[in-house]
Amino acid sequence: MTRISRGYIARRRRRKTSLVVSSSGASLSKLITQQEIKALASSDRDRDRQKRDFRCLWITRINSVIREGWVSYSYSYSKFIHDLYKRQLLLNRKILAQIAIANKNFLYLISNQILKSEVNWKESAGVI
């Protein structure tokens, strides 16, 4: 019985997977396929991880600017966010981090207004 070549279909499929895994030094299609599966799993995992990492970075930036001491002695990120929600000032953390990096004075202005309105509210309610 004579040998029949399969044609270009398998070669085209292997070339396509080897282009996806471009850094592959292996010529074995099995290793290339395994690398492709691992790369796709890593990219899927790291898309979710990237969201967490950026949120953590934004929180760290906001907290460092708030704790510099201009605002209040015991003021922290958690109290700042709590006061923002109490005043219904819904600014997301990405925007607050950009404000903290680009224009610290504006963030101090926001936090001082929050603290002043809290003091005024306590005075009018007779708490102090």
UniProtKB/Swiss-Prot annotation:
GO CC terms of this entry: chloroplast; ribonucleoprotein complex; ribosome
InterPro entries found in the cross-reference section: Ribosomal_bL20 (IPR005813), RIBOSOMAL_L20_CS (IPR049946), Ribosomal_protein_bL20_C (IPR035566)
Coiled coil: none
Molecular functions per Gene Ontology: rRNA binding; structural constituent of ribosome
Pfam families reported in the protein's UniProt record: Ribosomal_L20 (PF00453)
Record keywords, A-Z: Chloroplast, Plastid, Ribonucleoprotein, Ribosomal protein, RNA-binding, rRNA-binding
Gene Ontology BP, a term: ribosomal large subunit assembly
Cellular localization per UniProt: Plastid, Chloroplast
Similarity annotation: Belongs to the bacterial ribosomal protein bL20 family.
Function in brief: Binds directly to 23S ribosomal RNA and is necessary for the in vitro assembly process of the 50S ribosomal subunit. It is not involved in the protein synthesizing functions of that subunit.
Protein name in UniProt: Large ribosomal subunit protein bL20c
Organism: Trachelium caeruleum
Gene that encodes the chain: rpl20
